């Protein structure tokens, strides 16, 4: 009984405005940020290095290189209300499900071919 209840509650939280994207794609995620009494949308753009989970618990990790060559990774719940938008900037062609090897690479070595 409780499993059915959890699934029903989860179905209400599902988002329908999520574009189709895969590991290796470059995406721009708009995240709602609360500062004091106002709320704004902050964009986080990078390469999807991982997708995992299913249903309401599905999440993905985006990696980007910030200033001075520091790598920054953020993990987002796919159906989270804090996510304002997800836009696919470019589609990458990769042969792995998890791109953890990008953590050890920088510059041209971290490039991903574009999917046609």
From Swiss-Prot:
GO terms for molecular function: structural constituent of ribosome. Keywords: Ribonucleoprotein, Ribosomal protein. It comes from the Bacteria. It holds the Pfam family Ribosomal_L19. Transmembrane segments: none annotated. InterPro entries: Ribosomal_bL19, Ribosomal_bL19_CS, Ribosomal_bL19_sf, Translation_prot_SH3-like_sf. One of its GO terms (biological process) is translation. PROSITE patterns: RIBOSOMAL_L19 (PS01015). One of its GO terms (cellular component) is cytosolic large ribosomal subunit. The keyword Ribonucleoprotein applies. This protein is located at the 30S-50S ribosomal subunit interface and may play a role in the structure and function of the aminoacyl-tRNA binding site. Belongs to the bacterial ribosomal protein bL19 family. HAMAP family: Ribosomal_bL19 (MF_00402). NCBIfam families: rplS_bact (TIGR01024). This is Large ribosomal subunit protein bL19. It comes from Chloroflexus aurantiacus (strain ATCC 29366 / DSM 635 / J-10-fl).
